[in-house]
């Protein structure tokens, strides 16, 4: 049985590192939304970034990435996969974000993560990444529209927690 996309949230790598660092607001977010029946998901690029950081990143990120990789299943965070065609679509979308200066040149993976989240039909990407949170919302929606992809909104976990109150 497929998960209901309205009850799914995608997480980016930064949030996994925040969880591994045991930041209270990250733990509160995970626990609260899972209690409310949300499925927390990570895409292929997040998995690759986590693997790379845990083996090649600088400290303390390497330690946190290793811890996150070990705890993903304990935290009940599930990866999703995409087809080769979907991966190509994600790469083209990330290129378009770069072309429109919506993400910095060294943040190509942020574009991939946004596209992968869209292709998985998950409407929100939960992140603490300033690059993602600072993207012009209207320009991002237009970019999704131009690519014929479902829009995804990057949102900080604290903002989601506040929305519950």
Label each PLM-derived region with a short phrase.
Residues 54-63, 100-106, 134-139:
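Short, flexible/disordered intra-domain loops and linkers
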Residues 77-124, 130-134:
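Active-site neighborhoods of divalent-metal-dependent phosphate/nucleic-acid chemistry enzymes
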Residues 63-84:
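Low-complexity, serine/threonine/proline-enriched polar segments
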Residues 1-6, 11, 23, 42, ...:
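Acidic, PIN/NYN-like endoribonuclease modules and their adjacent C-terminal/linker elements
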């Amino acid at each position: 049985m497929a998960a209901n996309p309205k009850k799914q949230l995608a997480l980016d790598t930064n949030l996994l590192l925040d969880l591994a660092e045991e930041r209270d607001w990250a733990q509160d977010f995970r626990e609260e939304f899972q209690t409310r029946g949300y499925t927390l998901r990570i895409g292929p690029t997040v998995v690759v970034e986590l693997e790379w950081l845990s083996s090649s990143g600088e400290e303390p990120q390497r330690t946190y990435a290793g811890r996150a990789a070990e705890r993903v299943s304990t935290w009940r965070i599930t990866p999703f996969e995409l087809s080769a065609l979907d991966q190509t679509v994600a790469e083209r979308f990330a290129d378009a974000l770069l072309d429109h200066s919506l993400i910095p040149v060294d943040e190509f993976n942020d574009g991939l993560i946004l596209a992968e989240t869209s292709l998985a039909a998950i409407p929100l990407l939960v992140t603490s990444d300033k690059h993602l949170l600072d993207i012009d919302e209207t320009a991002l929606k237009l970019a999704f529209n131009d690519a014929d992809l479902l829009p995804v909104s990057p949102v900080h976990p604290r903002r989601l927690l506040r929305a519950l109150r």
